[in-house]
Design a protein with these regions (language model features):
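Phosphate- and divalent-cation-binding pockets in alpha/beta enzyme and binding domains
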Residues: 18, 59-62, 148, 182, ...
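Nucleotide and nucleotide-moiety/phosphate-recognizing core
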Residues: 2-103, 107-135, 143, 167-174
Length: 197
């Protein structure tokens, strides 16, 4: 019997309003930040990667031209994170579980991602990384949670669903801080850039 079919949903539709420019296109050793993120997910052996685009969709597609991904466009990206999450879940709902990833987290360790996937046990599971007692990203969601994820609205992420289902959560402790670092500010972007040097 084969294992569960797990896909990744990479959220890459946002406006980067706190950054002044599209952070996903920031250069890291000749590669856009989004390509670094997707590359680490692919290296973990994820079956299929869905990239949700919105703002500057064509430029994001160009940045990932050599990546083996499926693009999902979110016309409502300006309404907030939840619309992108819904678009990704709807496109990938035939899978048993979804690894929901932020596009601006290029330091997530591929070995840690493999451990998250290995920790998945059934359709009600939620697998979350923990570093220094802080919950990180990405989060692996079993199929039983897809309907709830599809009901999110506004700029609300899925953290509230995680809190409401704590008995189904498997925490995977990691030593790498990449699960906590996303490029939400110019300072955070610089910290990530220094970490990749």
């Amino acid at each position: 019997m084969s294992g569960p079919r797990i896909a990744a949903v990479v959220l890459a539709a946002g406006l980067s309003s706190r950054m002044g420019s599209n952070k996903l296109l920031a250069d890291f050793h000749g590669q856009p930040l989004i390509a670094q993120t997707v590359g680490r997910i692919a290296a973990a052996g994820v079956e299929q990667i869905f990239v949700v685009t919105g703002h500057q969709a064509e430029v994001i597609k160009q940045a990932l031209a050599s990546a083996k991904v499926r693009f999902v466009h979110n016309d409502a990206y300006a309404s907030g994170l939840a619309s992108s999450l819904r678009a990704g879940v709807a496109a990938a709902k035939d899978h048993d579980a979804l690894l929901v990833c932020l596009g601006d987290m290029p330091l997530v360790n591929s070995a840690d991602l493999k451990r998250f996937i290995a920790a998945y046990c059934d359709d009600r599971s939620i697998v979350v990384p923990v570093k220094d007692r802080q919950l990180g990203n990405p989060v692996l969601w079993g199929k039983a949670h897809f309907k709830t994820l599809l009901s999110l609205t506004g700029d609300r992420g899925a953290r509230s669903i995680l809190e409401e289902n704590r008995e189904r959560v498997t925490e995977v402790t990691v030593t790498d801080s990449g699960v906590l670092l996303d490029a939400d500010t110019p300072e955070a972007l610089e910290q990530i850039r220094e970490s990749l040097s």
